[in-house]
Regions:
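Glycine-rich loop at the start of a catalytic domain that most often binds anionic cofactors/ligands
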Residues: 114
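Active-site-surrounding "flap" and adjacent substrate/cofactor-binding loops of secreted or lumenal enzymes
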Residues: 117-120
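A structural signal for small-residue-enriched, beta-sheet-centric alpha/beta enzyme cores
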Residues: 24-107, 111, 122-370
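N-terminal export signals
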Residues: 1-21
């Protein structure tokens, strides 16, 4: 399998002697561009549903493929909260999903998957070992949650947390439009000391592959360089999608975390995300893409993957676009590298677009001086 890759890479290296002399090769087929809407839904076959509860300051986001799709997950945070991620492990029977849920609410938010599963099951969607009258399918709805319980919202819900109902509301009108910032799973999120939010971005390669990301940013770490308004993700910005400040020239003290959260608590922080592509790759390939996409969090948040975070990344493929000619591992590497860059941009966009919900205090990125 690796002979073709070994033979290809030296050839590419010999051709990379001038400015973009490698264009037209499998490594760099030519300049790509941001997708039409710069959202995860630029990936063919996806819609997104969102809902929030302003009183509780929490929300739910659902990524809905038009059919079951291959999926993988990579968990890096020290305090994750997930549902059905084991189903995506190599060697297991079901490595495809009917939907992905990102939710606020910590452990209570895992109940949002109940609403999505009910919605899907009522429409006959799900995994079926047998098709018999009266035997419903089992929708596969992996879910990741973030902690927004201490943001000042009213969490006195007793025996009836709102997440199942929020999920059903999100499924009322799934759309290709995605509200960024204070919306969905990012409604009550906090990114370090700044208001966090829901972010998305996309990229289309010259040979037609699309990669998109959707992320709820609720990190311990800071998304900006200490003492500045510059996003850590600045070098990866395309156009002015999150302010246009670009990279910072500031020297960074290794022990200065800048606008990180003070006095972090275990499982009180988390960045949860979904990567999507239309490239026709399988669950094993998607596992590598999810792993590589974690680099995007490291590019956009400092620190990240701490004992206090529950960082989780799903990666799915709608399979609408065949891989171009060339070694498959090379294309997987390309997709993983793109996923990391797109996710870094999505993180910054989520915080850039965030505003304070009614009654909530604290700084937003737009309120920073300078």
């Amino acid at each position: 399998m690796f002979l073709g890759l070994t033979a290809t890479l030296p050839m590419l290296a010999t051709r990379r002697t001038g400015a973009r002399a490698d264009e037209g090769t499998p490594l760099h087929p030519g300049p790509g561009h941001v997708g039409p809407t710069n959202l995860i839904t630029d990936v063919t076959g996806l819609t997104v549903g969102e809902a929030h509860d302003a009183r509780s300051r929490t929300g739910v986001t659902v990524i809905l493929p038009d059919q079951r799709v291959a999926c993988a997950v990579d968990v890096r945070g020290g305090g994750p909260g997930t549902r059905e991620t084991d189903a995506l492990t190599a060697g297991n029977l079901v490595r495809s999903v009917d939907a992905i849920v990102l939710s606020g609410g910590s452990v209570y938010g895992l109940g949002s998957a109940d609403g999505v599963a009910a919605w899907l099951g009522a429409r006959g969607r799900g995994f079926s070992m047998t098709k018999q009258p009266g035997v419903p399918p089992s929708p596969i709805v992996p879910t990741a949650i973030l902690f927004d319980l201490a943001n000042g919202g009213d969490k006195h819900w007793g025996l009836n947390p709102p997440y199942r109902d929020l999920a059903l509301k999100a499924m009322d009108h799934p759309s290709r439009r995605v509200t960024l910032g204070t919306a969905g799973a990012g409604y009550g999120a906090q990114a370090g000391a700044l208001k966090g939010g829901l972010g998305s971005a996309s990229f289309v390669t010259a040979d037609g592959l699309t990669v998109g990301a959707l992320v709820a940013v609720n990190s311990l770490g800071s998304v900006v360089v200490p003492g500045t308004r510059h996003f850590w993700a600045g070098p990866f910005e395309i156009g002015r999608e999150f302010g246009g400040l670009g990279a910072s020239a500031a020297h960074v003290d290794p022990e200065d975390w800048g606008r990180a959260k003070l006095n972090p608590a275990a499982r009180a922080n988390t960045t949860i995300a979904c990567i999507a592509t239309d490239a026709d790759i399988d669950a094993d390939d998607l596992k590598r893409v999810a792993m590589m996409a974690q680099d995007g969090l490291a590019r956009a948040i400092r620190p990240v993957h701490s004992p206090f975070d529950g960082d989780v990344i799903f990666a799915l493929s709608t399979g609408h676009h065949s891989l171009p000619p060339g070694p498959r591992p090379l294309h997987v590497a390309r997709l993983g590298a793109l996923a990391a860059d797109v996710l870094a941009r999505a993180v910054a966009r989520g915080v850039y677009e965030a505003n304070l919900p009614p009654g909530m205090d604290g700084p937003t990125w737009k309120s920073l001086p300078g």
